[in-house]
Curated annotation (Swiss-Prot):
It comes from Psychrobacter arcticus (strain DSM 17307 / VKM B-2377 / 273-4). Keywords: Cytoplasm, Lipopolysaccharide biosynthesis, Nucleotidyltransferase, Transferase. Its EC number is 2.7.7.38. This is 3-deoxy-manno-octulosonate cytidylyltransferase. Activates KDO (a required 8-carbon sugar) for incorporation into bacterial lipopolysaccharide in Gram-negative bacteria. Signal peptide: none annotated. The lineage of its organism: Bacteria, Pseudomonadati, Pseudomonadota, Gammaproteobacteria, Moraxellales.
Amino acid sequence: MSSALMPVRTHIVIPARLKSTRLPNKPLLTIHGKPMILWVAEKAQLADFADDMCIATDDESVAKVCAEAGFDVVMTRSDHASGTDRLAEVAAIKGWAAHDIVVNMQGDEPLIPPLLLEQVKTLLVQDAESVMATLCEPIEDYNTFIHPSVVKVVSQNTNNQQRAIYFSRAPIPCDRDVVLSDEDNTQAPKNAYRHLGLYAYRVSLLQQFVHWSQTPLEILESLEQLRVLENGGHIAIAKAACPLPAGVDTQEDLDRLNAMSLTAFQDD
């Protein structure tokens, strides 16, 4: 059977690294008594559009917890330069077809709506010329806009397809009139968008990605998606269909989630 006639399968992969500079042992830290990675995996199970789901980790303790809970675990190397490189290893281990789609679900977002996972997958399916898809949301306040930890994205409409032009930790786009004025800045520009770290990839891209050296802008910004743009790939992008609740980066984030009602994690 030719590849054009073969069905396209969708795989959800949850990368889970134990090492974190801001919050050590993050995947195994508990929310209402359950390791965070298991909350995330249970959310992934609600995404009924996917053919399968697995957790990718380089740590035996994470693998043990996930396997004992009944989840598929793939052990990966510990020396990957980025999460995308790790997904490429998973795709190779699993032997997924080049035309299949991989959805990267962050392991520190236990409240992510499954709707967003489906949206990013559908976005890639609908743009045959893009090798990757992601989501964004408007930035309303100026402090968020200028913060380096918030990744900004600018995009353009090409042939009725919205595609990313550039991602940056810098405040882009720049409103020239505001920058040159003496007034205090209180809000972000109208076209300011925050990039959400949710991706869908074609396996064929992952196969190429690992053979590309890290690019100058990728290294400068520490943003792996720039490697795709610098190598001429198109990244489809759309405004998220619903809000993405904040994930867990710090102990304060973890405390906030533990203070929430248990039903917030159990609802569809």
